[in-house]
């Protein structure tokens, strides 16, 4: 079985420490994962980056609910991006959709301008797209998105495996496709056999962290 890249989704400093000890390749730091993740507390961010040597992504999401952001929301998003850039973060996770459940390319370009030269991973919000493959292609064509989190339009990576495999086949040379959605230490190998991807993401992908 080929080497796979493990991205561990965490909420706290102790989870970051334990994920590093267990061999994670990268961390995604969020808050409120029960709500699909929000922007983490910046004191936690600073503590993690002071003490962890591996690559770290930061979620940028100012509120729960949908991903159709108001002008006021976008102002807050810009503030959050500006701040995490100043403290040394070089990769963010972000998603934005319009009222028609399509990727909001205009706001993606704004966020890319604000965050440059940071990398961007597009959030699993892509799974709610009314035109899933068309919107992934639009993201790829911006040449501003490094990677994409997806459950293949399903609730779990396992049930969406066939769609994820198609995404990798169509776009994997242009964007990192990160399989996500209830991936755990116990089901990772089975999911990998179905998808044959390179990148996997989960809160319990390395088992319990605290």
Language-model features and meaning:
Residues 99-103, 107-111, 121, 127, ...:
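Active-site pocket-lining/capping segments in soluble small-molecule metabolic enzymes
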Residues 5-18, 22-38:
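N-terminal beta1-alpha1 ligand-phosphate binding loop
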Residues 11-22, 58, 68-83, 106-108, ...:
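Catalytic cores of alpha/beta
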Residues 41-106, 207-209:
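Glycine/small-residue-rich loop that forms an oxyanion/phosphate-binding "nest" at active or ligand-binding sites
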Residues 2-6, 23-25, 52-56, 88-90, ...:
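Short, well-ordered coil/turn segments that N-cap beta-strands
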Residues 9-13, 32, 59-65, 97-99, ...:
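Active-site beta-loop-alpha junctions enriched in small/polar residues
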Residues 117-156:
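Histidine/lysine/aspartate-rich catalytic loop segments that bind and position anionic ligands
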Residues 25-38, 83, 87-99, 143-158, ...:
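Glycine-rich phosphate-binding active-site loops on the catalytic face of alpha/beta enzymes
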